[in-house]
């Protein structure tokens, strides 16, 4: 059912994928239209493409408000593994998306534990302070 949407999100046309991600994100804040897509987004968390990982993580977070079946309960541990991604942009974008998730789901303990386990030493000196700042900002909301 969502095969075409997944193709666009994961396709080689990154501009189209990014625009489509923004469109799905906006729509996800207004309706549960893409909630059923959660199960299909999950495997994308392991994509080789960093942007695909970010898009899937973020869209899954945006479904938290509609998670009447508690689908995210079975995915949250794998989602939080992205907070230790090798790409600092993935870590930063995932931390950003967690703000939305934590409004609707009580994963505070798991999220805080994952934030505390981020190894900032593996990132360049230019990125580590930015990630630390993101971590501190999210912790203030927990």
Located regions from the model:
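Flexible loop/turn segments at the boundaries of HEAT repeats in alpha-solenoid HEAT proteins
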Residues: 26-36, 64-72, 101-112, 141
């Amino acid at each position: 059912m969502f095969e075409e949407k997944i193709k666009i999100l994961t396709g080689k046309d990154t501009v189209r994928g990014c625009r489509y991600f923004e469109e799905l994100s906006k729509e996800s804040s207004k309706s549960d239209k893409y909630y059923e897509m959660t199960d299909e987004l999950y495997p994308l968390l392991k994509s080789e493409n960093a942007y695909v990982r970010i898009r899937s993580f973020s869209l899954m977070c945006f479904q938290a408000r509609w998670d009447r079946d508690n689908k995210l309960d079975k995915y949250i541990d794998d989602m939080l593994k992205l907070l230790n991604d090798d790409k600092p942009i993935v870590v930063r974008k995932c931390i950003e998306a967690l703000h939305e998730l934590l409004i609707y789901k009580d994963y505070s303990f798991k999220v805080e534990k994952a934030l505390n386990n981020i190894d900032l030493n593996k990132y360049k000196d230019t990125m580590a302070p930015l990630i630390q700042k993101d971590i501190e900002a999210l912790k203030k909301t927990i």
